[in-house]
């Protein structure tokens, strides 16, 4: 429990001085990088709040599209919204809420209730068993890209193996879906995506 660790560090005087502090590991690989890039429902990339007009204006201009300034739902709130019949479809990429949600029975019931579920993953996970559509994704050694570790260091990965069968890189699948939905996405390589990220994330300029 994070609060217990914080309390312990405070009680023992291990906060605010050299060689002290907390450094808890995050739950999954690259969760730090995903958070930095804006995969938090109330934030744009680099932890810029969606309900601040100057942030919204910046990203609307950069992406040339209108954006909603309402905060999104957390994973737990999404499961509640499915039970309330306000969410009817989901696209789950690289997550397994049928095993990771704090209330598994509640989450599994929610996944069963969806009218349409798309899952993109490298394995046929427990969540994928509820899916109407499965996109097979590439594993880490099968693609180019970066991850950000808990220490906020960006680490490059280079493709070492070809993907099996019909598996594709995550960015490619997302890019193709965007194009088929009418978006003018023209990414050809993760390098181009990273260059755009650097425009939105001052934290990368280190």
Spans of model-derived segments:
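Non-catalytic alpha/beta scaffold blocks inside enzyme catalytic domains
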Residues: 1-7, 11-205
